[in-house]
Amino acid sequence: MNRTQPYFHSLRFIACMILLAICLKGQALATKRHSRMEITTGSVNSVVIRGDSESAVIYGGADNQLENIDWVLLAHHRRDVVWAAEDLIAQGAKVIAPAAERELIESPELFWEAFQQGRFHDYAQQSTKILGQGLKVSKWVSEGDDLDLGGVKLTALETPGFTRGSISYLTEIDGQRIVFTGDLIAGMGKILDVYSYQDAIESANIRGYHGYGGRFAALLNSIEKVKQLDPDILVPARGQIITKPRQALDKLEFRIKELYRSYLSTSALNWYFKEERMGICAEQVLGVNAKFSLMPYSAYQDTPDWIWVKGTSRLLISETGHSLLIDCGNPGVIQGVKELLKTGVINKVDGIFVTHYHDDHTDSVQAASEEFDCPVYAVQHYVDILRHPGNYHMPCLHHTPIRDVVSKQHGDVMEFHEFKLTFRAFPGQTFYHGALLVESPEQAPVFFIGDAFSPSGMDDYCVLNRNLMHKNDGFLYCLSQIKELGEDYWLINEHIPHVFRFSAKELESLERGFQTRVEAMRALTVWDDPNYAVDEQWASLYPYGLEVKSGTIHEFNVILTNHSSKRRDYDVQFRLPPGAELMSVTKAIKVPAGALSGVRAMIKLPSKPGHYLLRADIKSDGIDVRDWIESTITVKSGE
């Protein structure tokens, strides 16, 4: 649905026209020909400005039929907005784009070529909503660069945050100062998501993987820059037009800080990075001398001697000499276990349990399984990513498939000599995560929880791990399982050479802190459920990565997770690479609240060898995201 509103001579008129557009529910409004500017809201907003000598469109034409456009101005490199400009560019409009993102706009093919291997063991954690093919840009702009249309001038403002090199544009028409803010803001105190802000925090020596809100500081600086301009109107790339900029930006600043303050209060990184580095992070976002809290360390002690410690692996040793390996991230673990066999500490490795798919826990699991001739166990919901890592795009993805994985259901029990083993779904640090509860008559229960918690809190620092926020999944579900253990238990995170546990009071504090974060996320983002803001893969293409011979017909599935509290009807439209053909497809699908389902397509892939992107648009009530998801395809010669 598009709502068109002409700009005349006053802010009051614009506000009235916005209200009228809402009341008309999509009926087109008449546009007087003498107006300088026309705004059409939609999945991507479209702004047409006509000067005395030239015309320009900001963001793109969206679904409008626009003619005689000289320039199209891009706010950033991301294809989920840039698609709206493609028709105008094809018609001959010249492109203006941020110089800071030149490589991703001009030659994205280089990114995708490197990404075929770079997507494994990826610790940078940047969005891959990147163009498939480069654009010819006529003018690269940085801070202060102008475009004079004749009677109307547009000035570039560097406003990083949503992307590293985002640009906003400032103009003044009839005495009204207007800023076209890109994705800096998406509504009254709201942004589109949080995962887009994941990045390294160099001043604290924190890489992208651990950089929760890593570009929040840049965003806050950009907000302040726009506030200093004292604008009358903000026009974002997506979301509602803002006629009270100061109020909207103040709310956004407050909400970002509230979310980050909540994150710090329960962060596992306090154990690893200590107060000094966490303080640097806090100062960048919250300000100098701002108040924030870090969770004090919980109780911990040395690991008992019947659990062997090696890197991010553990070996559960029975009094019989039999053993069970927990994770295997490198060949040194295999060599260490062989020494235990050689010296008689153990007489057999009976199996391997994998807590989650991350490379530092899985890279040598297949080799260990072959070396010790033993089965590999995992909980059902992440078995496929262990077997077929190339079908996924996730942080820290291992590259070596684990061929034979025994799938266990949540709650399955296995007797292992004097130990009782209970397999658990434990979607903590990542969605694809499990845990193993080990009980014995003589010992307090030991819960192998992968990387989900440390003595200072929860490992939710990488949003792209899919840290969900529903009551019955994610960290709240993990906390409920720990609570069930009572007071006498121990937790093992294999990055920590100790066992540790939380008191009842600490568990309540963690749960309360996370619930506060859920509400902060809800207030900050535009979706009807905050999980969309932290789960980039609520929609994804499966398989994500594919290597095939030319002319292959292959099945692809768009996997949809409905985080909303209502049933959703989805429509999926594929964007095929050149030379591909859609053979069959499920056009629409109904997904109950909280459920997961998919749209299946059979696609004949190109015959010409090369790298390609298959992409898709997703539509539902209140959701219209285009060029949103991708699958990378490498076509090899059929010979």
Show which residues each predicted segment covers.
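Conserved beta-strand hairpin/beta-sheet module of binuclear metal-dependent hydrolase folds
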Residues: 29-65, 168-182, 186-187, 291-342, ...
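Metallo-beta-lactamase
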Residues: 55, 146-149, 153-246, 251, ...
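Low-complexity, acidic Ser/Thr/Pro/Gly-rich terminal tails and inter-domain linkers that flank the onset
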Residues: 518-549
